[in-house]
């Protein structure tokens, strides 16, 4: 369910460096974002995990220079024929605080060559590479769109930002994925019945207002609960709790499958 949508508009893996036509805006003495292996762009305190391919990154720890407002900007994209588009990329970004300064990172777009920028998302910090999924439909309908990664060190000596595997794509309308099932791998029969709980994320382009929540034990009968009155926006995660508990009759090894169907009355397209 993590497959990108029906068509990829543009994608960049950075294996050949910073793409032709991309530009930067930086006051840093090291030139801003660089391209290369994770090890070549790392430093003592900003050690980037190797994702197995080249990346782009800006390293404030190594430079300790002015990275107060740094932009890595794509070339111009014609999105005039699109109404719904999403972006995905991997980021390596701590979002840390040091000596009273907190670093920040955003994903933005412009339709006027960078005179003004509109924020699409504040990047989610993590201790390692993490996938960012962003609705960029606000940029659709324009023929001169540029996206940008913005890093700010708030005037301090912080860490940095790494980016890899960046794509702009048209999503499926309906694409819901069960992310987790909060059930121990080993449970005691004396604790039955068990409530099946977990999370589901909407990777489609449409807000989900109703769905069937299903589970099946091994090759048994599907147990379905119809849910209405929902509002699961694109890239929002929903915590579910199935209304029908599972009550195994004997000890053993079981396979539990959980999925959603009948999304707004239609089918999951992925």
Task: Report the location of each language-model feature.
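Short, surface-exposed loop/turn segments at beta-strand-coil junctions that are enriched for proline
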Residues: 80, 137-139, 245-251
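Conserved Ser/Thr-centered positions that define the repeating blades of beta-propeller domains
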Residues: 107-111, 216
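Extracellular beta-strand-rich recognition modules
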Residues: 14, 72-96, 105, 143-153, ...
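Extracellular/luminal regions of secreted and cell-surface proteins that mediate adhesion/ECM remodeling
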Residues: 119-122, 129, 156-270
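Extracellular beta-rich ligand/substrate-recognition surface
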Residues: 58-70, 122-127
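Extracellular glycan-recognition surfaces and repeat-rich motifs
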Residues: 5-63, 100-102
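Extracellular carbohydrate recognition and processing domains
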Residues: 115-140
């Amino acid at each position: 369910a993590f497959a990108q949508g029906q068509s990829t508009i543009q994608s960049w893996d950075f294996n050949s460096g910073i793409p032709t036509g991309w530009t930067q805006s930086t006051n840093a003495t090291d030139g801003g974002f660089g391209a290369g292996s994770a090890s070549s762009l790392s430093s003592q305190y900003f050690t980037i995990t190797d994702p197995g391919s080249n990346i782009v990154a800006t390293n404030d720890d190594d430079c300790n220079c002015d990275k107060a407002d740094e932009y890595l900007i794509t070339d111009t994209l014609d999105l005039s024929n699109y109404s719904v588009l999403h972006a995905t990329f991997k980021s390596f970004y701590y979002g840390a605080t040091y000596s009273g300064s907190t670093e920040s990172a955003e994903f933005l777009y412009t339709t006027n060559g960078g005179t003004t920028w509109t924020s699409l998302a504040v990047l989610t910090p993590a201790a390692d590479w993490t996938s960012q999924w962003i609705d960029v439909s606000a940029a659709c309908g324009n023929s001169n769109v540029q996206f940008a990664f913005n890093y700010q060190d708030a005037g301090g000596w912080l860490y940095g930002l790494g980016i890899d595997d960046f794509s702009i794509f048209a999503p499926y309308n309906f694409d819901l994925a069960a992310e987790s099932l909060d059930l121990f791998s080993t449970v005691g029969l004396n604790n039955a019945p068990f409530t099946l709980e977990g999370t589901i994320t909407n990777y489609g382009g449409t807000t989900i207002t109703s769905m069937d929540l299903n589970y099946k034990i091994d090759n048994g009968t599907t147990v379905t609960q119809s849910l209405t009155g929902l509002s699961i926006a694109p890239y929002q995660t929903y915590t579910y709790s199935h209304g029908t508990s599972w009550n195994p009759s004997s000890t053993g090894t079981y396979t539990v499958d959980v999925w959603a169907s009948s999304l707004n009355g239609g089918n999951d397209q992925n």
